[in-house]
């Protein structure tokens, strides 16, 4: 039995609020249960130096957690003077996932910077960030088209992400913190709206997992992501 009484395949309620802030071209508050992440997408003309003159754009991401997003306050990374390895890993994951969804040639020599700030953490912050960032990205691209800055829509497909894992010997979907901290296996899966895999991050935290368990986890992720994409589409409609 899960602490929340959810079934093994049951994700937490997902809520997406668009245009959450006034200034960003795309702005979303996404909630995976008690995990809440603010995702903004900023459209700027021009590209990093390594892409100049190549006729293509760039999408990148930054990620951070507010000091009291967790049970006890933590220092801001700016105050520490450097980002943690975890932060760097997560923001690279978000950037890679979103770049897979964008036709960089259609974007032209423009850059979209995604900022994901965790307001409240209860497990699955990176998967919530990817899911919310995708919706913010859509809004930023639509803004750019409306301004005539790009001619066609560079978005190839929606993407979403969910965590899966083995908790007390049972594969489950969308782990909250109490499950994540005690899971034997922890995995984050990013997929397209049609169920194609973009990235899998999986680790045996306690016991190694079998090939059969891996397939079971991927099936759970596919089912969960399908439901999350439906929420994205409803928010964008």
UniProtKB/Swiss-Prot annotation:
A single GO molecular function term of this UniProt record: tRNA nucleotidyltransferase activity
Gene Ontology biological-process annotations: rRNA catabolic process; rRNA processing; tRNA processing
Entries under PROSITE patterns matching the protein: RIBONUCLEASE_PH
Gene3D superfamilies: GHMP Kinase, N-terminal domain (3.30.230.70)
Pfam families in the record: RNase_PH, RNase_PH_C
Catalyses which reaction(s): tRNA(n+1) + phosphate = tRNA(n) + a ribonucleoside 5'-diphosphate
Binding site for phosphate: 86, 124-126
InterPro entries recorded: ExoRNase_PH_dom1 (IPR001247), ExoRNase_PH_dom2 (IPR015847), ExoRNase_PH_dom2_sf (IPR036345), PNPase/RNase_PH_dom_sf (IPR027408), Ribosomal_Su5_D2-typ_SF (IPR020568), RNase_PH (IPR050080), RNase_PH_bac-type (IPR002381), RNase_PH_CS (IPR018336)
Enzyme Commission code(s) on record: 2.7.7.56
Enzyme class: transferase
Keywords: Nucleotidyltransferase, RNA-binding, rRNA processing, Transferase, tRNA processing, tRNA-binding
Record's subunit section: Homohexameric ring arranged as a trimer of dimers.
Family label: Belongs to the RNase PH family.
PANTHER family: EXOSOME COMPLEX COMPONENT, EXOSOME COMPLEX COMPONENT RRP41
Described purpose of this protein according to its UniProt entry: Phosphorolytic 3'-5' exoribonuclease that plays an important role in tRNA 3'-end maturation. Removes nucleotide residues following the 3'-CCA terminus of tRNAs; can also add nucleotides to the ends of RNA molecules by using nucleoside diphosphates as substrates, but this may not be physiologically important. Probably plays a role in initiation of 16S rRNA degradation (leading to ribosome degradation) during starvation.
UniProt name for this protein: Ribonuclease PH
Gene name as annotated: rph
